[in-house]
Amino acid sequence: MEPRQLFSDPTADPISTAGAASNALSCASFNLPEGGILQLPNGEIITLSAPAAFKPPSCNLALRSVPNIIASGGVVGGTASGTMGLKADDDSHFSDWRDPFYASTFPQCYALAATTIIAYTLVIMLFITPRSFLDGGVVVLGRKGFTNGGGGTSIGGRPWLQKVAALSVAISLTIANAATFRAAEQQYSWGVQNAKQLQEDVLGGAELKIIRIISDTFLWLAQAQTLIRLFPRQREKVIIKWTAFALITLDVIFQSLNSFKYGGSDLTRPKFTEAVPALSYLFALALGVLYAAWVLYYSIMKKRYAFYHPLMKNMILVAVLSVVSILVPVVFFILDISKPDFAGWGDYVRWVGAAAASVIVWEWVERIEALEREEKKDGILGREVFDGDEMLEASQSEHAWPKMKRKGSGGSDSQDTESGGGGKDGGPSLSRFGAWSKISTLTSKHRTEPSSRNEPNEGSSPVAETTNDDERPRFLSPPLWPARPTPAATPVSRTDTTSAASTMYAVRYHTMTELTSYGTPPPTRNMGRLSGSESRGSSRHRDYGSASPGSAPAQDARSTQNSHVGAKASSAGSRWHALTPTVSSRDFVTRSEPRSSKMQRDENSRWDLRARVEEFAATQAENLREKFRPTLDTNNLPVTVIPAPPRRGAAIAQLCEEEELNHSSREGTVREESRNSNASGTVIAVGGAQTPIQTSFSPPPRAANSSMSTAQMPRPQLSPIVTQGSFTNNRYNHLPVTVIPAPPRQDPARAPSQPQSPSLVALGKQPARSDSSTTPSP
């Protein structure tokens, strides 16, 4: 069409203008400006909302060269042959001729090509390229953690949700590329460029609608899985999981309704004239914003490793890519409000941005955790445990701790779960007693297992430790709760009782042969067992400490002798001695612990005949050993009686009484009577206020061969009255003193015969003490 000037130009030549008008009179075309009003014969009035052109039907366009009007408002040179295929129903292709450049077809095609390349790059990262990790401060390639062994933590694995999501995005963008090329070629054949129509043709396809819904579902699930990894607490993981499932379900429902039921609505600009498209857009926006907020919160909490670290110089690049990928939904939400035309090609960027937000953030988190492990691997702290996590993770399949190891790893590996009291699948006690049985099982495991493993080390023979094939060194975790200490059998304090002579002590008596052969026997340990078989096997062993006083020495001596005999049998290296009657109950408990602990796994099985037969055989064998075990007679052993020391406060009372007597006596009488007492061999003390009182002590009977006089005898330990009373006062230091030996500490009539072992005696009841009578002097 040829443009025509509607208003006269004052600078134009009137002669040339008239000639041009006469030449174009037969085929006149008019350019109608925006805002013009057209009035039709039927009275209808049309207001032009955009520039238009009027062309008379008699104009022969095939013989003239006219410019073509493109959708962007510009004019390019060309022939009219490019518009010969237009029809009357193609007016919708020229709905907007003045779209800005950022909303035209060129940025849309470039954006689609760039996002497709990024999508395939993510797929290559997930499926082909090996992962990088930190190894001793150097970033290397590989698929393992810090070590390549079985104990290393693998950080190279990727969840399958990310792989499916990235692959679906790449497939979707490939289909969008094919549809865009087809629609652009059709517009090129028409000689026009309409970005809005191009976008509607591409996104309106049924195949792309279906693949987009599937891709979005896996994208949101992958992001939810990434969020679950960010937070270690089990409670937070559960909250994130169910919140994500609810939002993803609602988003899929409303997106499906918006794509198929409300397909006639505007797909390129969010003009929310109906509720379903608005809700679909709202749920998609909520998922993106929540994901971005939680990832930013995690990066702030881990700011020490998240943005820069000397061991990983490229951490800042990964951090920038992660932040950009998670902020894409927020940025385009702002652009949708301020510039709605951006939605034409912004959908592709948001599409691949959601995939990158999951893949790159996962890599970011793995690098942060690798730096944390590298820094804390030499620390002394253990795993971080939160309150309530053990109860939330409790299940019947995960009841036992530690978990059951492989069968081929040895007999010792299977014992980690045998002492917990559970069954083969972790213990059926969870269904019987609830979740609290997990705590009690863990407590019983740690209380019983170390005592059974360390028990052979307490024997007198070091060879006995190697007789058990199941005893192998293992590294166990510390107990969750400290074990309750065994009750200590402490004797009653004799000074706090009303009668100091009423306390009796029972001690073991050993012959000289036993002392020289084995030395001091180890104390008997009181071991408690939770299972029925072990409690029956060790019931007699525990009864030794709770027996009556009369039978306690015999039972203790019996257990001590049997323990020595068992140690001798173990040191010989022959396992046949384990079945002889001379084996002790402690060795039996130690050797039968692996077997009894294996039976604990099947204690709730009614049809486990093998376990029942083994338990019955163990019980009968213990009964036979109890019958054939020899006993020692400890009732006829010699007894030596040792008197109890004086009670607290008696010496002080006597001292005060002696001081009162000394101060009330007269000095002259004491001097005269003390001279007279030198020949009689008595110690005179003055008592009373007026008359002197003489106290004499009879000397004890002595042996016939003793010719030592009283003054020449070695000075024994003085009584508290003499030492702290009269002889420590400065007033009586010049008085002569005659020391009289103390009386014997036991009744000569009750003196026993010479014991077999003078070094070890038995304590008994204190007899009545006979002191010399005190008679006043005449």
UniProtKB/Swiss-Prot annotation:
Membrane topology: Multi-pass membrane protein
Compositionally biased residues, Basic and acidic residues: 446-456, 588-605, 661-675
Ranges of Low complexity composition bias in the record: 749-759
One GO biological process term: cellular response to pH
Family membership: Belongs to the palH/RIM21 family.
Subcellular location: Cell membrane
Physiological role: Required for the proteolytic cleavage of the transcription factor pacc-1 in response to alkaline ambient pH.
Name the UniProt record assigns to this protein: pH-response regulator protein palH/prr-4
Polar residues composition bias: residue spans: 457-466, 720-732, 769-778
